[in-house]
Amino acid sequence: MNIHEYQGKEILASYGVRVQRGIVANNAVEAVAAAKQLTAETGTGWHVIKAQIHAGGRGKGGGVKLAKNLQQVEELAEQIIGMQLITPQTPPEGKKVNKVLVAEDVYYPGESETSEFYVSVLLNRGTGRNMIMYSTEGGMDIEEVAEHTPHLIFTEEIDPTVGLQGFQARRIAFNLGLSGNAFKEMVKFIDALYNAYIGSDASMFEINPVLKTSDNKILAVDAKVNIDDNALYRQPKYAEMRDIREENPIEVEAKEVGLNYVDLDGTVGCMVNGAGLAMATMDLIKYAGFEPANFLDVGGTADAKRVETAFRIILKDPNVKAILINIFGGIVRCDRVAQGVVDAYKNMGDAIKVPIIVRLQGTNAEIAKELIDNSGMPILSAVQFQEAADQVKAALS
């Protein structure tokens, strides 16, 4: 579950991480009030107006602006709230901005130069360990750094039996080129950040940039946080941070009816039982020269109602040009699934305007094929995996 920057900073602050202070605002009037409050509490004269959406690259898209007075705070808040913000990480149409974070300006002059770093904590699925990834190249897309200057990215693997050790936090601060008070502050920052990651059951905490201020303080200027969905049952206060408006509406609907659905960019809709078979089906579609439009696991109870619901969800994606149903009948009987497909087709009528290819293998597969072939519906049936792929290719060629 992704959360907003301001929510991520709330979690960080609760674990002792120093963050750029800010107040969330839903309109220009609230933004001005927030700026006045920040000035009274911090003395800051300038403010940063930051769009709050679940995507990075907001600055490049015009979603982060500097306001030098209250009039600019009001003007920029009016400009950003309600806009369709397009970044490299949003859909082509962008995302609507519903709120902004009015933050203090932390790039003030002082005894030393400011420096920006990149620090993230995430799970390394290859090693099964948590990992801290960091770089001196803060404020940039880490993907660009990895592509052009990979030697500037460092990693620190964390042994799960002992957790983050002091020498590891010190090594990170050393590799970032810090010394004196800034070195000590970074060690504290890394320790608190890791504790926040573990304590919140997160799968990622990305801070970009981490700022060394001109008076040698270390603070989080941004926060991109993902909480593990499987742990939300024991993190109720973080579960309340969910913003459904930021999520794909089709995925939200599928989740509400118990379907495991992930929206993708292709043209071939998939309806499969079992995650492993679903991934294999997606591979087969790609080998056939096409792209899957979704990942959809209907689970072990693929009855008529569930199949019809899955059909309706898949067809909400206007990019779908064909649907491939691939079911292995173990616990589920193939003839029941086939009847569900036929019934769903009858119930939905003209709503289904794309070719449907059905491959059923396992319990009562022969009966299922007869049901489909004798239904009178324009449904193509296949026996072999490759045969199904060939039928998809023929339907879309």
Swiss-Prot record:
The keyword Cytoplasm does not apply. Residues 9-253 form the ATP-grasp domain. It catalyses: succinate + ATP + CoA = succinyl-CoA + ADP + phosphate; GTP + succinate + CoA = succinyl-CoA + GDP + phosphate. ATP binds at K50, G57, R58, G59, V106, E116. SUPFAM superfamilies: Glutathione synthetase ATP-binding domain-like, Succinyl-CoA synthetase domains. The keyword Ribosomal protein does not apply. GO terms for cellular component: cytosol; succinate-CoA ligase complex. Binds 1 Mg(2+) ion per subunit. Its EC number is 6.2.1.5. Mg(2+) binds at N208, D222. It comes from the Bacteria. Substrate binds at N273, G330, I331, V332. Pathway: Carbohydrate metabolism; tricarboxylic acid cycle; succinate from succinyl-CoA (ligase route): step 1/1. It holds the Pfam family ATP-grasp_2. Keywords: ATP-binding, Ligase, Magnesium, Metal-binding, Nucleotide-binding, Tricarboxylic acid cycle. GO terms for molecular function: ATP binding; magnesium ion binding; succinate-CoA ligase (ADP-forming) activity; succinate-CoA ligase (GDP-forming) activity. Succinyl-CoA synthetase functions in the citric acid cycle (TCA), coupling the hydrolysis of succinyl-CoA to the synthesis of either ATP or GTP and thus represents the only step of substrate-level phosphorylation in the TCA. The beta subunit provides nucleotide specificity of the enzyme and binds the substrate succinate, while the binding sites for coenzyme A and phosphate are found in the alpha subunit. Heterotetramer of two alpha and two beta subunits. Belongs to the succinate/malate CoA ligase beta subunit family. This is Succinate--CoA ligase [ADP-forming] subunit beta. It comes from Flavobacterium johnsoniae (strain ATCC 17061 / DSM 2064 / JCM 8514 / BCRC 14874 / CCUG 350202 / NBRC 14942 / NCIMB 11054 / UW101).
